[in-house]
Amino acid sequence: MRGARPAAGGGRWVEISPERLRGWLDGFYGRHDGAAEDSLTLTGASNGDTATLHPPPGFDGVTDVDGLLTALIRPPRIGLLLARKGAVAAGVVDGTAVVVSKVERHYVQGRTAAGGQSQQRYARRRDNQATAAANRAADVVARVLLPYGTADAEEPIGALVCGGDRLMVDAVLADRRLAPLLPLRHPHLLDCPEPRLAVLQDAAVAARRVRIHLVP
């Protein structure tokens, strides 16, 4: 389980690995003298505390706790896209194993303290480098994920999970070739450092966790 983080609007988030979820639920029931279930929300009998379970990406049809526990036994295949200024990583994940992947680094100049024409020249160069980096990243995503991103694919992905810098991810997915992936994009953005293979493997594990919103 990852440590609790404050949630916007109140409460806190915890993330539970699939194999630990049943034990976590047993603990919640025990601490609250039982709980009422309404879809994916548990309400503690002793004090009204609530826990709302958010299934991992690709579990769109899950509507109750029992259904979630059953679905977690055989999770769907998912795609990963991690992007930051200096690198991109794309992969296909079965369970928590990355079965297809590609990582590519690129150079984008940092900001400069120079002023006047020099600053404008650096800014133009930096913008050009950022555009070129997004284009190369889109090439990587097209090669790795598009073969799995359509309904008629032999082994389609059930969701696209993104991580890193949201602006960079958006720039990559703006490529028209990647339009078939957009309906699969999951809204939650993984927090990750500059992509490497090890980071991609860590993201494959993180993407499978069940996110739980606890109030209070």
Tell what function each PLM region has.
Residues 1-216:
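Terminal alpha-helical anchor/extension segments at protein ends
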